[in-house]
Amino acid sequence: MISVTVEVDVDRPPPEVFNYLEDAENNPKWIPNMRSCRWTTPAPVTVGSRYEQTSEFFGRQIHTSFEVTEHHPGRLVTIESREGSSFPLKVTRIVDARADGGSHVTEEVEGDPSGFYAIATPLLRAMVVRNIRRDYKNLKRVLESAPQ
């Protein structure tokens, strides 16, 4: 089992940050190894909404189906991979307001790798931490450089 938590401060208002994060189709814009991401259910995002994504990790294409399993608009969204995905994964993204009007973002990732990935669990955890930190630096850069 892999469990990782990453936090970042973003100098943008929480509603803007949350709206960007909850729309999975934005993922390829700030996650470099994300190749594609599309909703398979209609808007708005709510518990039960689903999307498909393709990413690359360890040089392998990873196809994952996700479902929103918890949703508190403006603050928290949890997604979980569904059957047929490369490996079980649960991701929770939380956006909290800072006193200065900016946002504090927390991402909690839990995964249970199997097959090829299970063999490499210690290396996999280190790479996941590194990649998520890089991703959230990108998120900060993308959102803070966007016109207000």
Report residues per predicted region.
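Short, cysteine-centered beta-strand-loop-beta hairpins and adjacent loop/turn segments enriched
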Residues: 56-62, 113-116
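Short beta-strand segments that buttress and anchor functional surface loops
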Residues: 49-56, 77-84
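Beta-strand/loop substructures that line and gate deep hydrophobic ligand-binding cavities in soluble
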Residues: 80-134
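Hydrophobic ligand-binding cavity/cleft-lining segments
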Residues: 1-40, 46, 148
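A short, structured loop/turn motif at beta-sheet edges
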Residues: 14-15, 42-45, 69-74, 94-104, ...
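Short amphipathic alpha-helical signal-transduction/dimerization elements
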Residues: 128, 132-147
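Hydrophobic/aromatic beta-strand elements that line small-molecule binding cavities or substrate pockets
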Residues: 6-8, 39, 64-70, 89-97, ...
